């Protein structure tokens, strides 16, 4: 139950952050609901469990910081409403919205640049892969044209296959024995 109360408190905290600047009155209500949830979690917590007490204490500390933040926002909000006329307030809100839109545009631009670099890197890797594939094919072609090297390469690949089959069988037998006797 305590964990559910703390989870609800965290949800209220995220809602508080979203509504702080757009609707400070709603943020105040969310803060009060969050305080009630934390007090209920605190009353149901086991005092011998130091971890849960520390968790609840940190939640209360964050609640106090958010209350201070809300008080600051409310003071600024009240000061703006007293000083600014409704038209000036609307202009200020439009200006803030424009700043936020510019910030979003900048982050989208940065993301697009990052994606372009990633695609360019991918193309470079594909090009390097094709170059290395061509080099490997040329070396194998040259090696196959020389009879002595061709025989050595064939024997090596046959030994590798044989060794890998033997190793695979050994590992599978050991795994089966381990499973049966464990």
Swiss-Prot record:
Keyword vocabulary terms for this entry: Golgi apparatus, Membrane, Protein transport, Transmembrane, Transmembrane helix, Transport
GO molecular function, one term: SNAP receptor activity
Compartment(s) where it occurs, according to its Swiss-Prot or TrEMBL record: Golgi apparatus membrane
Species this protein is from: Schizosaccharomyces pombe (strain 972 / ATCC 24843)
Coiled coil: none
Pfam family, one: V-SNARE_C
Family stated for the protein in its record: Belongs to the GOSR1 family.
Protein name, per record: Protein transport protein gos1
């Amino acid at each position: 139950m305590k964990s559910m109360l703390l989870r609800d408190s965290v949800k209220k905290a995220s809602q508080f952050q979203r509504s702080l600047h757009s609707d400070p009155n709603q943020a105040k209500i969310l803060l009060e609901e969050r305080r009630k949830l934390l007090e209920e979690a605190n009353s149901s917590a086991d005092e011998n469990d130091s971890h849960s007490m520390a968790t609840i204490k940190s939640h209360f500390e964050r609640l106090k910081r958010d209350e201070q933040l809300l008080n600051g926002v409310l003071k600024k909000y009240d000061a703006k409403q007293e000083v600014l006329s409704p038209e000036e307030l609307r202009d200020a809100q439009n200006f803030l919205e424009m700043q936020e839109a510019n910030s979003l545009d900048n982050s989208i631009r940065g993301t697009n640049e990052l994606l372009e670099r990633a695609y360019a890197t991918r193309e470079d890797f594909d090009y390097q892969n094709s170059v290395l594939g061509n080099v490997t094919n040329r070396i194998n072609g040259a090696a196959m044209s020389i009879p002595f090297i061709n025989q050595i390469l064939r024997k090596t690949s046959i030994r590798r296959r044989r060794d890998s089959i033997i190793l695979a069988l050994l590992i599978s037998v050991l795994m089966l024995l381990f499973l049966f006797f464990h």
